[in-house]
């Protein structure tokens, strides 16, 4: 059995972000401006006003959009944003399928550019954490449903899962139900599952 890494006692709330896709639409500067506006006018002020001791932020994958390249302006903004977030609260970044260079490997990723930032932890491989007595699995993108099921079976004591997964049967929006991916029933045993 894998023992969890114990984090600071008295954990507070979890702020969840997902699928930021920095560099979307071929590194569009227009889209970057929209993202900047959201973070600078809405998210960061809200976070600064409401964050409490013990709170953490989890970015559940696809921080970046393009597997092959990132515009330098896009990368610089993302790094500055995560530096700012790390000054406010601990940040956990899970690797998503758009963050990896090779389809079946998490070895080379765009989120590696964030690993040097203080108070920012990246997850390229699964890791079990203990947050205030709760066993929390941080599970990055797995190459297919079988690999995902296998990974979950390696962490039988996990109670909460933060992951980047394609889950069959969930609603992608109010009208569109995902028709492919890992069957949602493998997540039924967990108290909470947060996926990008």
Label each PLM-derived region with a short phrase.
Residues 1, 29, 138-139:
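Detector for methionine-enriched segments
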Residues 20, 63-64, 74, 139-141, ...:
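Long, contiguous hydrophobic alpha-helical segments, chiefly transmembrane helices and signal peptides
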Residues 8-13, 20, 24-128, 187-191:
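Core catalytic region of metal-dependent phosphoesterases/phosphodiesterases
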Residues 14-16, 58, 138, 160-164, ...:
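Structural motif
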Residues 78, 95, 99-187:
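Conserved catalytic scaffold of divalent metal-dependent phosphoesterases
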Residues 1-7:
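A short, compositionally biased domain-edge/stem linker segment
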């Amino acid at each position: 059995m894998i023992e969890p890494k114990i984090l600071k006692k008295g954990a507070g709330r979890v702020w969840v972000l997902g699928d930021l896709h920095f560099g979307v639409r071929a590194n569009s500067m227009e889209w970057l401006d929209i993202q900047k506006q959201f973070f600078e006018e809405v998210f960061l002020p809200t976070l600064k006003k409401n964050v409490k001791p013990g709170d953490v932020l989890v970015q559940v994958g696809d921080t970046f959009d393009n597997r092959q390249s990132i515009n330098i302006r896009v990368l610089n903004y993302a790094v500055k944003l995560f530096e700012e977030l790390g000054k406010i609260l601990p940040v956990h970044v899970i690797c998503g399928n758009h963050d990896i260079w090779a389809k079946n490997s998490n070895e080379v990723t765009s989120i590696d550019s964030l690993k040097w930032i203080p108070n920012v932890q990246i997850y390229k491989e699964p890791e079990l954490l203990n947050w205030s007595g709760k066993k929390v699995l941080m599970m990055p993108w797995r190459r297919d449903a079988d690999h995902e099921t296998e990974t979950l079976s390696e962490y039988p004591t996990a109670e909460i899962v933060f992951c980047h997964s394609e889950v069959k049967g969930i609603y992608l929006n109010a009208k569109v139900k995902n028709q492919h991916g890992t069957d949602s029933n493998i997540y039924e045993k967990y108290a909470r599952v947060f996926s990008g």
